């Protein structure tokens, strides 16, 4: 078992990581090979379009590293499905978009590996709650 020097969490555009900040300074302070990481990350996420991909990079004492990519943030998936640039500044007053229950279920299925929900329905409720807090209304929810 290698000794862990640090754990870095970043959110980077898929296939477009560069050695510029935030990647360079975050990995540089642990002495990890920045170019090696950006090449590996870009190769692994090239098929994800323009999504923002959260990544957890574990850097070891011998300066080697491993990384795990996660699913895109829920707010990103909701904005994309509703065709929005950003959520509502006042979600309780101004509604900025609509999603139907099928879209909510689709987002829930995408996020399932990263959620601690026991079922797709439970995950869908989590998605619906996030959407509501962004000022997006949900149509056709089974128990809303």
Swiss-Prot record:
UniProt xrefs under InterPro entries: Ribosomal_uL11 (IPR000911), Ribosomal_uL11_bac-typ (IPR006519), Ribosomal_uL11_C (IPR020783), Ribosomal_uL11_C_sf (IPR036769), Ribosomal_uL11_CS (IPR020785), Ribosomal_uL11_N (IPR020784), Ribosomal_uL11_N_sf (IPR036796)
PANTHER family in UniProt: 60S RIBOSOMAL PROTEIN L12, LARGE RIBOSOMAL SUBUNIT PROTEIN UL11M
Modification after translation: One or more lysine residues are methylated.
Gene Ontology terms describing biological process: translation
Subunit description: Part of the ribosomal stalk of the 50S ribosomal subunit. Interacts with L10 and the large rRNA to form the base of the stalk. L10 forms an elongated spine to which L12 dimers bind in a sequential fashion forming a multimeric L10(L12)X complex.
Record carries keyword RNA-binding: yes
Name under which the protein is recorded: Large ribosomal subunit protein uL11
UniProt xrefs under Pfam families: Ribosomal_L11, Ribosomal_L11_N
Organism: Deinococcus geothermalis (strain DSM 11300 / CIP 105573 / AG-3a)
Gene: rplK
Function, in words: Forms part of the ribosomal stalk which helps the ribosome interact with GTP-bound translation factors.
Keyword Ribosomal protein: yes
Similarity field: Belongs to the universal ribosomal protein uL11 family.
GO molecular function, one term: large ribosomal subunit rRNA binding
Keywords: Methylation, Ribonucleoprotein, Ribosomal protein, RNA-binding, rRNA-binding
GO cellular component, one term: cytosolic large ribosomal subunit
